């Protein structure tokens, strides 16, 4: 069974353009926050943590309000000049990645499929303890 750190390591192995991985539980509590080794963050660490715990619930929660009408969210992406942020909702977590800004659609699909498979392999396909 994979733990959160092993899932993060596996996500980094998917593509060298993945700069950062954050994993949040369904209450948007930050479980993991890690930059790729050797990659400099564009933002201070505290800003990253604040963004994940404040902005992620607002952005994803707002988008999920359309779920009954439009279906499940595959991913939510925000493209900045210098970085691409991608949010993937899984059964047990919200996985947030930052990538190099010109990542193509096919790569985002492949990463999303892999993130979901990794989580299933971890045995965390259901709700977390305490949720």
Regions found by a protein language model. Give the residues of each.
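Non-catalytic interaction/Regulatory regions outside core domains
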Residues: 1-131
